UniProtKB/Swiss-Prot annotation:
Belongs to the universal ribosomal protein uL11 family. It holds the Pfam family Ribosomal_L11_N. It comes from the Bacteria. Gene3D superfamilies: Ribosomal protein L11, C-terminal domain, Ribosomal protein L11/L12, N-terminal domain. PROSITE patterns: RIBOSOMAL_L11. This is Large ribosomal subunit protein uL11. Forms part of the ribosomal stalk which helps the ribosome interact with GTP-bound translation factors. InterPro entries: Ribosomal_uL11, Ribosomal_uL11_bac-typ, Ribosomal_uL11_C, Ribosomal_uL11_C_sf, Ribosomal_uL11_CS, Ribosomal_uL11_N, Ribosomal_uL11_N_sf. One or more lysine residues are methylated.
Amino acid sequence: MPPKKKKLAGLIKLQIQAGQANPAPPVGPALGQHGVNIMEFCKAYNAATESQRGNVVPVEISVYEDRTFDFKLKTPPAAKLLLKAAGVAKGSGEPHKTKVASVTMDQVREIAKTKAEDLNANDIEQAAKIIAGTARSMGITVQG
């Protein structure tokens, strides 16, 4: 007989700084209510994201009924990557009136390549259009 498949008890989605997960909120309470060993997750996450320090890395944690877990790392949010590329701290308060920065189409394509696996697009050009739309809604102009 094949081994029994674990039954999923919950799915937790978090955005945590790479290599900086600790039991303090938001990580502790989110995992605690599902009965997951918080320190075990923090150590595993920090080890997995060590190379991406400085970025916010979203994570999807699958918690099973026997209180074990596994997690899938996603790519950093497009907005964070755009802010980094543009060299600004935050987007515009009124994006269609005040522009805060600008990025080149090459930078947008680079971000699209990074995000390609998480985006709902068939090729890099479509992914770049999605990223350009995000930039526009943040008050960042795309040149080229």
